[in-house]
Amino acid sequence: MALVPIVVEQTSKGERSYDIYSRLLKERIIFLTGQVEDHMANLIVAQMLFLEAEDPEKDIYLYINSPGGVVTAGLAIYDTMNFIKPDVATLCTGQACSMGAFLLSGGAKGKRFALPNARVMIHQPLGGARGQATDIQIQAQEILKLKEMLTRKMAEHSGQPFEKVAADTERDNFMSAVEAMEYGLIDKVLTHRDMK
């Protein structure tokens, strides 16, 4: 079980304690950490919808430190980022790999950031299938459809040609923050707090 720090604030009505993530949510900061999976994706989607209801004009900040995970869970987050009215700024702290990199690149244009020592990794979707030959064929076709769609979206976000992204994602492709910026996955490497 992970330890989650508690912060205490003094108010005119006394003390109020929050877990650190709830306190940061008040500042419109959402953390995407660890494997991208359905439960985590649902929590992030709910937080984005809540913040949109609170103020549809103010940006939301999605901090990413993830090795990637389930494509459909990541797409739930991605679609919500594009569905809601506020811009979603993305910031990589640590790593944004696989679906984490896809979500990082899917932030609002001009508002996609990484810290100087962050690592970004892009590759094609992974999958496995077992069962009857027909079932394996169906799964393979689905993975190929997802690969084409993710490659097209990443090309759109990065400004790179589809063919280049397709070639660059054939195998794990690791980048520094500066290399991710040069590739077009992010807009700026932050060395201090200035998300403009």
Swiss-Prot record:
GO biological process terms on file: protein quality control for misfolded or incompletely synthesized proteins
Pfam families reported for this sequence: CLP_protease
EC code(s) of this entry: 3.4.21.92
UniProt key word Protease: yes
GO CC annotation terms, alphabetical: cytoplasm; endopeptidase Clp complex
Active-site residues, Swiss-Prot/TrEMBL: 98, 123
InterPro entries on file: ClpP, ClpP/crotonase-like_dom_sf, ClpP/TepA, ClpP_His_AS
Compartment list: Cytoplasm
SUPFAM superfamilies recorded: ClpP/crotonase
GO molecular function: ATP-dependent peptidase activity; ATPase binding; serine-type endopeptidase activity
Keywords from the UniProt entry: Cytoplasm, Hydrolase, Protease, Serine protease
Reactions that this protein is recorded to catalyse: Hydrolysis of proteins to small peptides in the presence of ATP and magnesium. alpha-casein is the usual test substrate. In the absence of ATP, only oligopeptides shorter than five residues are hydrolyzed (such as succinyl-Leu-Tyr-|-NHMec, and Leu-Tyr-Leu-|-Tyr-Trp, in which cleavage of the -Tyr-|-Leu- and -Tyr-|-Trp bonds also occurs)
Record family assignment: Belongs to the peptidase S14 family.
Stated name of the protein: ATP-dependent Clp protease proteolytic subunit
Protein source organism: Actinobacillus pleuropneumoniae serotype 5b (strain L20)
Gene name for this UniProt entry: clpP
